[in-house]
Amino acid sequence: MKRILFFIVTNIAILLVLSIFLSLIGFTGILQSNGIDLDYDSLMLFSLVFGMGGSFISLYLSKWMAKKMAGVQVISKPSNDFEKWYLQVVERQSSILNIKIPEIGIFQSAGPNAFATGSSKNNSLIAISSGLVSNMSRNEIEAVIGHEMSHVANGDMVTLALIQGIVNAFVIFFSRVIGHFVDRVILKNERGYGIGYFFTVIFAQVVLGILASTIVMWYSRQREYRADYGGAM
């Protein structure tokens, strides 16, 4: 669940930054002058390009963001018996799955938790919590690692990025349709876009983004079942 929350938070943040940046440089005005605010086919194309772009930026930042947000201490050189064992387990499972050995790390959390993230199966990170290390046996920890390695081997983060990109496109599209309606119909603005449009777009984008995240989380839950199966193999 942690990897999904990191991805969704990063994704929404990037969409907001892109939206604000485009507004500041007057990009929306350029679209309007070319009729894109009224041409729904063109608006959908614009939404798809920026929606997929935001999602894949999130994907490529996912490992870095996870390290920062969770405070992951990356293990480059094992310093104790557990870390040596941890690395050996990941190396062995990587060989079985025929993937590049992921970065490994531990983050501070009282509860037993773990996640996998990264831009591809050959550029990934596996992290486990200090609570998991303290409260589980090595056999149990190895099963958890197997679950996360299954996510990596199945390319779940890339597939998730594709789904998130499509969801983003609809969020961008409908937030601008709502903004256009508020600006033209409710606020009766007939000369360019007013401040009401920009605030409406940003607000709608946040709300729709949160609602749409349920689709992503549903998909993630299905992949969790698949990873459970893969981890047990």
Task: Give the role of each language-model region.
Residues M1-S19, S23, T28-D37, L43-F199, ...:
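Polar-ligand-bearing catalytic/cofactor-coordination segments
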